[in-house]
Amino acid sequence: MGLRETLCVSMLVAASPASAAEDFIKGVYLQTQELCAQAKKDTLQTLIDTGNVILSADGLQSVEYNCEFVQVTKATRSPSWAVTAICQEPGFLFPDILSITQMNATQIDIVSVRPTADEGEQAGNGGSYYLCEGVSLP
């Protein structure tokens, strides 16, 4: 392999978010523990169909809304990640930058730079999410 090919491969490996994401979000998270109980009782798809937002390592997902996590960078001094996301809803596609923090073994908090429409409204993609043990993505 020539110098040019070696350099290209090295750049791709260095840019890969795999090492930053190896301890990233594990499992499925919902916005309340009650929703987790409902997902176990019914199905996760039922909750998605009613408009609830699901958090996983892939991103945020709902019936007509999703944010794909395209770049994940691990913080060195806290259990946090800086995440670049591409979000879409019917008729709109937009970027977002998120800070995601593992608050404890079952809670993740997200802060979004996306502005809100009204004061007091939840900030963009931000909020708390709770681990739903025993629940898998459909």
Map each language-model feature to its residues.
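N-terminal helix-cap/turn-to-beta initiation motif at the start of protein domains
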Residues: 19-30, 55
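N-terminal glycine/threonine-rich, aromatic-flanked beta-hairpin/loop signature
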Residues: 39-78
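N-terminal signal peptide c-region/cleavage motif recognized by signal peptidases
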Residues: 15-17
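Bacterial N-terminal signal peptides that target proteins for export
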Residues: 1-7
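Beta-sheet ligand-binding and adhesion/scaffold domains
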Residues: 84-138
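Short, hydrophobic/aromatic-rich segments at coil-to-beta transitions
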Residues: 26-28, 57-58, 76-85, 106-109
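Sequence contexts marking disulfide-bonded cysteines in secreted/extracellular proteins
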Residues: 35-41, 66-68, 86-88, 131-133
